Amino acid sequence: MKIGVYGASGRIGKLLLEELKGGYKGLALSSVFVRQKCETDFSSFSHAPLVTNDLKAFVRACECVIDFSLPKGVDNLLEALLECPKILVSGTTGLEKETLEKMQQLALKAPLLHAHNMSIGIMMLNQLAFLTSLKLKDADIEIIETHHNLKKDIPSGTALSLYETCAKARGYDEKNALITHREGLRSKESIGIAALRGGDVAGKHTIGFYLEGEYIELSHTATNRSIFAKGALEVALWLKDKAAKKYEINEMFG
């Protein structure tokens, strides 16, 4: 399958190019979208990709787009994909409502998956969080996320997805149960998220389930950002030959 990388100059984008250099499980890099000059030397790649700032040409040259860019960039990408539908794997966070609506429109034409975190470990953490939230009904739930000091969005998209998982399991009102700044006593049907920023931490997420006399913490730590690139490539492989639909990452585990 021919892969197009959108957001190639970012941290994950560069890792995607590295993983695709020799062909990842039969995947081939066919196109790279760049706004300015690309620093990557493609002479060592098994196939020379199309490197372009022409969005339509970029989309036409691939069968699947993997996106790790910025919210505005995703909006532009979706406009092109609605004209020329291709498989989409998107890991960009902080998307506006209008952009998400365009994504739903694309899902009528092509398979796509949008996730805040592409690591296999986070996929499992989500499933464990749902089960634990369901079983430990009296436990207070708190989430702590830690990232590098250059991360802009707070809380992280992954922390918000974990919150949504826990809130759904409990039947909480998702719009009102989230607490990111607490004063006074803790309300019963609430889930707090605390965000820490420092150094070069790739990502750590901990969900605490606090009972009287004991507590359980479920934690995931990313020690290498390559897991996000590899996870996105695995999603692309999984989406191949799937029907047009917006898929959830937990569906990969059946």
From Swiss-Prot:
UniProt pathway:
Amino-acid biosynthesis; L-lysine biosynthesis via DAP pathway; (S)-tetrahydrodipicolinate from L-aspartate: step 4/4
Q: Where does (S)-2,3,4,5-tetrahydrodipicolinate bind?
A: H148, G157, T158
Q: Which InterPro entries match?
A: DapB_C, DapB_N, DapB_N_CS, DHDPR_bac, NAD(P)-bd_dom_sf
The entry's protein name is 4-hydroxy-tetrahydrodipicolinate reductase
GO cellular component term, pick one: cytosol
Give the NCBIfam families listed for this entry.
Answer: dapB
EC id: 1.17.1.8
Q: Which Pfam families match?
A: DapB_C, DapB_N
- The residues responsible for catalysis, as annotated, are H147 (proton donor/acceptor), K151 (proton donor)
> What does the UniProt function comment say about this protein?
Catalyzes the conversion of 4-hydroxy-tetrahydrodipicolinate (HTPA) to tetrahydrodipicolinate.
State the family named in the UniProt similarity comment for this chain.
Answer: Belongs to the DapB family.
Its GO biological process annotations read: diaminopimelate biosynthetic process; lysine biosynthetic process via diaminopimelate
Q: Which GO terms describe its molecular function?
A: 4-hydroxy-tetrahydrodipicolinate reductase; NAD binding; NADP binding; oxidoreductase activity, acting on CH or CH2 groups, NAD or NADP as acceptor
Q: Which reaction does it catalyse?
A: (S)-2,3,4,5-tetrahydrodipicolinate + NAD(+) + H2O = (2S,4S)-4-hydroxy-2,3,4,5-tetrahydrodipicolinate + NADH + H(+); (S)-2,3,4,5-tetrahydrodipicolinate + NADP(+) + H2O = (2S,4S)-4-hydroxy-2,3,4,5-tetrahydrodipicolinate + NADPH + H(+)
Which keywords accompany this UniProt record? Answer: Amino-acid biosynthesis, Cytoplasm, Diaminopimelate biosynthesis, Lysine biosynthesis, NAD, NADP, Oxidoreductase
Q: What is the protein's species of origin?
A: Helicobacter pylori (strain ATCC 700392 / 26695) (Campylobacter pylori)
Q: Which residues bind NAD(+)?
A: G7, A8, S9, G10, R11, I12, G91, T92, T93, A115, H116, N117, M118
Q: Where in the cell is it found?
A: Cytoplasm
Instruction: Tell me which residues bind NADP(+).
Output: R35
